A protein has these predicted regions:
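Mature catalytic core of soluble alpha/beta enzymes
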Residues: 1-402
Length: 402
């Protein structure tokens, strides 16, 4: 790995050619520490512990150091149970407060839970900040293109025009005093799919810090990550305590504490060294490799891409990320990664950056210094291009070209 001297790099593609970047792109995914041990005996040399739970159609995991592992694990398990509660609150796939809001708000204001209200306000702020590239009301377009039920279809121009009439967060009416929301249009629908997972991660992290835990990492489905504090390292470890990842870096083994394995052991590890939590960005065509690593301390990362959620029609591939301003699936980007203070912001901005494309995403980050981006797209001469802004050279390590 080497530091980037500039904000733009091209990477040689080992394939003879990128037939179609939309055909070859891997699913946008952040690589976090992944358990690779095969036996409980190997856990004795662990320097990371984690708990895991399925929610929101993905796996959530919380990583932490072994010191006081038993106590931290109990808190982490409760934090992940909170994620499940939040899913029940925000889902639009079954009866929930959100489905009630969608059914009622065009007729009368609907009072909602205060934290969800604040989340919707944040979503509206990001809608305005991104000039509509992120829009919580774009679910109608997702349905129109068949992604809601994973049955892809291509709507005609007339249908897209009709769908766009029911899209737009400018049609939301917020009443801060009563914490109610109303819709100006009867066909408006809110869907928190682009920000809800990040919100759940933020809430779980908040729960952890309220219980005195300062150093941990949470991810949801490897597309949203929040790191708190530092990753504490052992001063010394046995030779077999690490293994090499696909890019040659040492990847510590971890110990799973929840969902299908074993009870934690006590640890006497000392905290003599630390480093930022490192997450990897997957190469779009070499799925076993990382194209870059980002070091995180008290920051979040979100990544968006269309590698798996797509369909073909008459030989053309359509991805699930739709520009809410045009009603058309986005093209021209492998993946978009956002770095932000919170996971909710990173989640939403990753989608917005994918819609914007590299140039406008970088322009956005230049105007909003609290955010950063990494944009991966097709380059020239069978290369993969990476643009980034708002992430220091100390935080971003880029894979070498060879």
């Amino acid at each position: 790995m080497s530091k980037s001297p500039s904000g733009r790099r091209d990477f040689l593609n080992p394939l003879k050619a990128i037939k179609s970047f939309r055909e070859e792109a891997a699913d946008a995914e952040i690589q976090v520490p992944t358990p690779t041990f095969e036996s409980v005996d190997e856990l004795e040399d662990s320097c990371l512990l984690y708990v895991s739970k399925k929610a929101m159609a993905c796996t959530f995991q919380i990583y932490f150091t072994p010191e006081n592992g038993d106590a931290i694990a109990e808190v982490a398990i409760e934090a992940l149970e909170l994620v499940e509660q939040l899913e029940n609150q925000m889902t639009v796939y079954r009866s929930s407060p959100m489905t009630y809001l969608n059914e009622t708000a065009a007729n009368e204001p609907v009072r909602i839970e205060p934290r969800v209200y604040q989340l919707l306000k944040k979503g509206y702020e990001l809608f305005e900040l991104t000039d509509g590239a992120f829009d919580m009301t774009s679910g109608l377009l997702t349905k129109g293109w068949g992604f809601f039920r994973q049955q892809g279809r291509v709507p005609d121009e007339h249908e897209i025009s009709d769908l766009l009439k029911g899209v737009g967060s400018q049609h939301l009416i917020f009443d801060d005093q009563n914490e109610t929301i109303a819709f100006r249009q009867c066909d408006l629908e809110l869907n928190l799919g682009g920000i809800g997972k990040g919100h759940a991660i933020d809430r779980a992290a908040e729960f952890m810090t309220e219980h005195g835990i300062e150093h941990f990492l949470i991810h949801g489905g490897q597309s949203s990550v929040l790191a708190k504090g530092k990753r504490w390292l052992k001063q010394s470890s046995k030779p077999n305590a690490t293994e090499h990842g696909s890019t040659g870096e040492e990847v510590p083994r971890q110990k799973k504490l929840y969902d299908e394995v074993a009870s934690p052991h006590e640890s006497t590890d000392s905290r003599d060294a630390s480093e930022p939590w490192k997450v990897g960005l997957r190469h779009p065509t070499q799925v076993e490799n990382r194209i870059a690593e980002i070091g995180l301390t008290d920051r979040a990362v979100g990544t968006s891409g269309t590698g798996r959620q797509s369909f073909y029609h008459k030989g053309k591939r359509y991805g699930h990320i739709i520009d809410p301003r045009t009603g058309q699936p986005c093209e021209g980007v492998f993946s978009a990664t956002a770095v932000a203070p919170t996971a909710a912001e990173a989640d939403a901005l990753a989608t917005a950056f994918y819609v914007m494309g590299p140039d406008k995403a970088i322009e956005f980050c230049k105007s909003n210094s609290e955010y950063g981006c990494v944009m991966i797209s097709p380059g020239k001469s069978n290369k993969v291009r990476m643009d980034h802004f708002g992430i220091s050279e100390d935080e971003l390590q880029i894979a070498t070209d060879d």
